[in-house]
Amino acid sequence: SGRCLILADGFFEPHTYVKPGTKTEKKQPYYITLPEQKLFYFAGLFNKLDEELYTVTILTLDANDTMAKIHNAKKRMPLILDEQFQENWIDPDLNENQIKELITVSFTNEALKYHPVSNAIYKRGVDTNTPDILKAVPAIDPEMDESRPTLF
C-alpha cells in the first residue's frame, strides 16, 4: 500500500437542487476540468490485494468555494495536486506530519472550469465512454445557470 498519482483530464460531481416550495431533490452532474482540459493528477492511495489486483482511492478534502457551489450536499472535493507537489506526494520517505502538511498546501491554484452535463452518466446501459457525455446541457438550478444575466 502507499500513495499514488491518478491521471485525469476532468471529473464529475453531483449538484443537488431543491425547487423552491418543494422538498424534492434533483441531482445534476457537473463536469469539472482545468483550463483547456489540461491533464492533472489526483492524490491517491493504493492497496495491492494480490499479484494482479490493486485498489485505488482518491483523497478528498473540504470543498473550496467553487466546489462547494457545485458539490453542495456534501461539500467535498478531490485533491488535485499542483504540479510542484506531484513528486513529493509519491515520496516514500515522507513522515506523517509532512504528508498532512502536503495535503493542506498542495491543491492546485488553477481556476476550475465546470458545466452541467446529461444525467445519462447515472443510467445503466448507456455508453458513457463517448465525447457526447461531456457536452454542456442547461442547468436545472437557476443559481448555477452561467448564461443568465446578472446584476453585477
Stretches found by the model and what they are:
Residues S1-F152:
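A structured binding-face within diverse protein domains that lines the active/interaction site
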